Amino acid sequence: MFGGPLVINKELKIANNLLESLVRSYKSKSIYIEFRNLFEISFLKEVFLRHKFSYKRHLNLIVNLDDDTLLKKRMSESRLRQVKAGLKSGAVIKQAETIEELKEFYQILKEKYSQKIKKPLVDFKMFENFYRLPDAGKIFLIKYVGKVIGGIVCPVFGNKVIYEWYIGGMDDKLKKQYPSVLATYAPIEYGLKNKLVNFDFMGAGSPDRDYGVREFKSKFGGKQVEYGRYIRINYPLLFSAGEIWLKFLGMIKSL
């Protein structure tokens, strides 16, 4: 689950009742339950531990969209140059307008998940459903000479936050167009123009591991935070087997 228990005035009793009900309903139906926190809920740590959740350190980066000039001062000079160079090369940022465009982007994501992330990608139907719900968020595409070369799927919460969800670009093939850089910049630009509060990267990896993606994201002027994650493993053997299976799939795909 993305987010965390929503409780008014830090009411621990309400949070306890929510988690108690959740665990009772799903502990026998799920291998694990995980909260990927999108805001500060450290005051609930003892409540989570009481229900056999464990805390995992996990970073995030949040870009404040208060002012265009201030934001560009916070961004790295190299990243700003890449944005300008990509646009100057003829690449354009646009919102998805057709299912055909969305399918082109999905193929880019499939290749990324198969070759780099080495994990299954959700079915195209999910992206199509998101596209057909305009109030849910935005899908930005990067196009070059009429072809989709990258994009990003961004849920939007009210008039406050725009999130990075799925992102991919043909960076290896079109280096001068910087498709992933432009895809990341697209929701930032949209948020500035529409007076949103933050752009949320929705994760920057564990602080205990080197993570190249975190280095990439950090150059967009965001603030690093650690809201962490809480996980409850209901069936340890099945959970371990699933981890082994995913690693095995990754090895197979890399051959």
What role is predicted for each listed range?
Residues M1:
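Conserved short loop/helix modules at catalytic or binding sites
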Residues G4, I8-L12, N16-R24, M126-P236, ...:
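Aromatic (often tryptophan-rich) hydrophobic motifs at membrane interfaces
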Residues L6, E34-R36:
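Short, conserved beta-strand segments within well-ordered enzyme catalytic domains
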Residues K13, I31, S54-K56:
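Short, flexible active-site-proximal loops enriched in glycine and acidic residues
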Residues L22-K27, L109:
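Hydrophobic, Leu/Ile/Phe/Ala-enriched alpha-helical segments that form helix-helix packing faces
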Residues R24, R36-A91, N198, G203-L255:
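Terminal substrate-recognition subdomain of acyl/acetyltransferases
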Residues K29-I33, V197:
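Short acidic/polar active-site loop segments enriched in Thr and Asp
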Residues N37-K176, E189:
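A conserved beta-strand-loop-helix scaffold within acyl/acetyltransferase catalytic domains
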